[in-house]
């Protein structure tokens, strides 16, 4: 709830701490999940449908505004879409202390992963926020180039195939998370530095 977020941010300001937020509008996500399940859309692809970029962009903007009112800097984790990146970029242009972190997975994998005919393949890529299309990836790379996004992380949270299969028939029960810790730096070098998108520094 926003009142709890504001109170938490105020306490962080008192302590000199910087809060981290995973920005998605959970109320809207829950409504979309219920609608998709009612329509028997229960596979891994529905995970992405239930978490469109708008729920992330709205939540990112709201968290930024609340943090600013509380007088605390903010670190936004798992930035996956243009809407969230733009909220961060605009806030930084206004002098707000906001930092954004895309994941290597969001920079390189897109939403087509969820349409894979092999259920296990698609489920192994279920994470939140979900993968987006190439336009969102381009925005994230541009943010890293321009400095409006600062860190590339992994949110490493791997599950076995058996664990992922607990969501067969109900995408909301697929454990959210993928690996990435070991691969992050080589992939960032190959697809960032070697392509000229990023410098070594």
Language-model regions, residue ranges each:
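C-terminal structural cap/anchor segments
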Residues: 177-201
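Basic, amphipathic juxtamembrane/active-site segments
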Residues: 162-173
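Histidine/acidic residue-rich metal-binding segments in metalloenzymes
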Residues: 1-152, 168
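Short acidic-hydrophobic catalytic motif
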Residues: 155
């Amino acid at each position: 709830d926003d009142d709890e977020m504001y109170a938490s941010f105020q306490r962080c300001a008192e302590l000199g701490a910087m809060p981290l937020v995973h920005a998605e509008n959970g109320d809207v996500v829950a409504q979309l999940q219920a609608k998709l399940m009612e329509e028997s859309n229960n596979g891994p692809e529905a995970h992405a449908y239930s978490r469109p970029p708008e729920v992330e962009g709205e939540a990112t903007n709201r968290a930024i505004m609340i943090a600013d009112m509380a007088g605390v800097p903010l670190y936004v984790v798992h930035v996956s879409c243009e809407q969230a990146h733009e909220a961060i970029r605009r806030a930084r242009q206004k002098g707000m202390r906001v930092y954004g972190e895309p994941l290597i997975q969001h920079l390189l994998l897109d939403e087509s992963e969820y349409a894979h005919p092999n259920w296990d393949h698609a489920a192994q890529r279920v994470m939140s926020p979900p993968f987006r299309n190439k336009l969102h990836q381009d925005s994230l790379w541009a943010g890293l180039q321009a400095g409006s996004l600062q860190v590339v992380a992994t949110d490493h949270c791997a599950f076995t195939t058996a664990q992922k299969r607990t969501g067969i028939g109900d995408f909301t029960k697929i454990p959210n998370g993928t690996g990435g810790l070991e691969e992050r730096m080589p992939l960032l070098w190959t697809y960032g530095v070697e392509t000229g998108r990023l410098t070594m520094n």
